[in-house]
Amino acid sequence: MILSHTGIVRGASRDGRKVSGLTVSVDHDKLSQIVDREKQSPGIVDIRVEIVENEPLSVGDEIMRLVVAGDIRDNVIPVLERTLNAVKETVTHKTENFI
């Protein structure tokens, strides 16, 4: 089973303010630690993460792709969720451009 997540620049921030775009910075050491840890989970074959870093992004642009490959959905879904949450909470820092 292969599951993926594609992050897209939204037109509004979580608090509702309008956004014209953003830039993202990445802590590569933390990203490697998360991926290495989650790859050890039962049934997981591979995890790939690509993040557009230090480039101006506009509404609708892709920010990130996350792909988790594994044996069965019961193993893959939680790893995708944990990896995504960890990346968003500890790896990336977004600077939003408000309208």
Where are these predicted regions, by residue range?
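N-terminal, polar/charged subdomain of small-to-medium soluble alpha/beta proteins
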Residues: 1-64, 69-99
